[in-house]
Amino acid sequence: MLRVRFAPSPTGFLHIGSARTFIFNWLFSRHHGGVMILRIDDTDVGRNTEASLTSIFEGLRWLDLGWDEEYKQSERLARHREMAEAIFQKGLAYRDFTPAQSGETEKSGAQGTWLFNSEMRHLPAHESDRRASSGEPFALRFRVPRDTERQVRFADSVYGPQSKSTADIEDFALLRSDGMPTYHLASCADDAGLEISHVIRGQDHLTNTFKHVLIFEAAGVAAPQFAHLPLLVAPDGTKLSKRRHGPVVSVTTYRDAGFLPHAFVNFLCLLGWSPKDDRQQMTRQEIVEAFSLEGINRANTEVNFKEDDPFDPKAVWLNAEHIRALPVEDLAERLLPIVRTAGFPVDLPKMLAITPLVRERMKLLRDVLTVADFFFEEELPPYETSELIPKKGDAALALAVLEQAAWTLASTGFSHDGLDAALRSAAQSMGIKAGQLFEPVRVAVCGRKTAPPLFGTLEVLGRDTCLRRIDQAIAKLKEL
């Protein structure tokens, strides 16, 4: 069975590049009816933090994709050491008693790379056993073949055939001197033990894969199929990092800004992958059906943001499209906690009434606080009296319009259709265009010229609020 894994280390927040790796693994598993595994690679005890682990789980749960099995590497240490011991017993690893700070390097290989070289590689077995028995600490290193140069090869599902000379691969550690496994050993041991069929990870792991192929060969187990993903880069071409680019690289930044999880998944999956047609906005099921490793590009993918605008315009556009496509009930339930957190005691029925009026104007969920604030605030923020004056009109006309509107609203039924008919009739009786009446009324009740559809807005605000705000606008005009 197809089995894939996402294996974050709890040493930092959930990076959007890591989130994309998780998404691609999830899509691949769901497309093929396979198993999605979450494996926490927590063997680097000195760097692990509980805050990082919390951030990772919060980010993954927000993406709302889920996984089938969950493991921690720290609970599988016996398996790691078992593989290391098996490799050592075959003579394919050696004990290195060299203190970590005094390891030697040498320049070798066609690429002129600096590789770790230890004299311990040539230590006689009996001497190695004696020193180990005496309690002298040691690391365990993989004995990369040196007698005859050979090519380590594997086929990558994205980047194609890969090869590297053993002359350019150092004797890398399998176990540290404290007995803890290194990333290379733990990753391979767990990929083998969990029967991972495909390893899908970032292109920055490509060089590690040659070492992993050697480990799998030495352990006598089949290597999984590898697929490396192009990196996400900033507009200047640099790799995205929190130190350099700030919170824009963190998944929780997008969550807190008001992105929908399925819209954000839609955006991330299009960074380096294409459905082979011109579709942009896609449902989760549509993405699952279209996804393939063949659709992944090799070139690094730019996340387009600016210092004064932290979000990629494409991400914002996709989010707006998904907001419009969301059922009103679902969207209202997502908006309600945002409004309540801002201090407005709104109930769900009112939020259900407001949502269809404002969602066309929203790009992010948090926009509800700016496009619909007049529904929640008792008093409108200050606005210029001149905004009450309609086009091709003056203050006298604005005053007459609002006085007529107040009389009309006080005496008509407060339904959408009833308000529509009554206000149009009022404009006709005054001999003016409907827009010349609607404009002052809109500013009076909303505090702005650009607002949601007028009749629905009036209906939700209610007669008392509308009349009170119109009376306040009339008073402003009389002060001119």
What positions do the PLM features span?
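Helix-rich, typically C-terminal accessory recognition domains appended to large enzymatic cores
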Residues: 416-461, 465
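N-terminal Rossmann-like or analogous alpha/beta NTP/dinucleotide-binding catalytic cores
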Residues: 1-113, 208-221, 263
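Catalytic adenosine-cofactor/nucleotide-binding cores of aminoacyl-tRNA synthetases and other
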Residues: 221-382, 446-480
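Residue-level signal for inorganic ion chemistry
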Residues: 25, 56, 87, 91, ...
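Glycine- and acidic
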Residues: 4-10, 38-42, 194-199, 249, ...
